[in-house]
Amino acid sequence: MKFELQHTDTASDARAGLITTDHGQIKTPIFMPVGTCGSVKGVHFSELKEQVKAQIILGNTYHLYLRPGLDVLKAAGGLHKFNGWDRPILTDSGGFQVFSLTGIRKLKEEGCEFRSHIDGSKHFFTPENVMDTERIIGADIMMAFDECPPGKSDYNYAKKSLELTQKWLDRCFKRFNETEPLYGYQQSLFPIVQGCTYKDLRREAAKYVADKGADGNAIGGLAVGEPTEVMYEMIEVVNEILPKDKPRYLMGVGTPQNILEAIERGVDMFDCVMPTRNGRNAMLFTYEGTMNMRNKKWEMDFSPIDPDGCDVDKTYTKAYLHHLFKAQELLAMQIASIHNLAFYLRLVTDARQHIIAGDFTQWKSSIIDQLGRRL
């Protein structure tokens, strides 16, 4: 994987770049739709390409390990062959999912024992077998296995957690460097900066990660309940240290406002389930604000969902989408998911264009407040 830093905003740390993988190029800043089990919920790949304009999607190691399982994925020739997506894929290590299983997991220095949320069967993840699993899945970008401490962890727990994450990171890189890709194309490993909301721990973690010289670096453990301003502060602390010539990935974030604020602070890559999850619950993001399509106010509004959006937005009206949600038609969730994902991709594409044009901060300031309005 290669990263070319193409433009930097003169009034902020916002950047425009180009990531090149063996499955294609990714223009940054970029939003990556989440395909947890190998699919983006409710959206065909043809729609992801033509309507959403997705350049890269996510898969999740924990979920793919459980279903369909490694035997199926290996026999298929990896996730790209299995699901038919021929553009780049990034896989999360499954750490966040495993550590979310409160009460059904046991943490040890060797790794983490957990029970499947599907059938209760016991499993054990280590840095080594997670690297092996991600090799079998075959994503272009693999994430290191880390502990994801609760957002409100006290300092002592956060420090011990970071020490464990750093030990695991060393083991991840050792295993990654000892093994080869299975399917004839290159894979990259991104380490993850943890440290909760403690500046000194975040700085220590960022230095440790930067010293690995990886193809890119991730910031994890944010947007887990801490105040938004604290999240922005942690991003600033970390990005002062992470190398400027490598892409920076903020994991699991967030709202359109969050994304623009993070871009301004030097973040290049984003993922979040919010566009699809909120879409399935009738909440649509637009440049004017958010719309709850179940509200009666849309019942007689025969204007397009978004006249400046994708073809789906221009084809269907607000009144029709309101009707579909009231009637509990599956098409409602599909239309809303496509709209929201297309809007997120449009947002980061517009941000990139304004970074290149040199007026990103002015553009951001002109739209940031209205993005959060309820229409």
List where the protein language model places each region.
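C-terminal extensions of enzymes
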Residues: 1-20, 26-33, 41-42, 146-152, ...
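A non-catalytic, amphipathic alpha-helix used as a structural packing/dimerization or gating element
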Residues: 129, 133-136, 160, 164-171, ...
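Glycine-rich phosphate/ribose-binding loops and adjacent secondary-structure elements
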Residues: 163-166, 175, 179, 184-305
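Conserved, mostly hydrophobic/aromatic
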Residues: 24, 57, 92, 134, ...
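Glycine- and acidic
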Residues: 152-155, 159, 216-222, 330-333
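Short secondary-structure capping/turn micro-motifs that flank functional sites
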Residues: 65, 150-151, 225-226, 278-279, ...
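Generic secondary-structure signature for well-ordered alpha-helical cores
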Residues: 139, 170, 174-177, 240-243, ...
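Non-catalytic, usually N-terminal nucleic-acid engagement modules in DNA/RNA processing proteins
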Residues: 1-182, 296
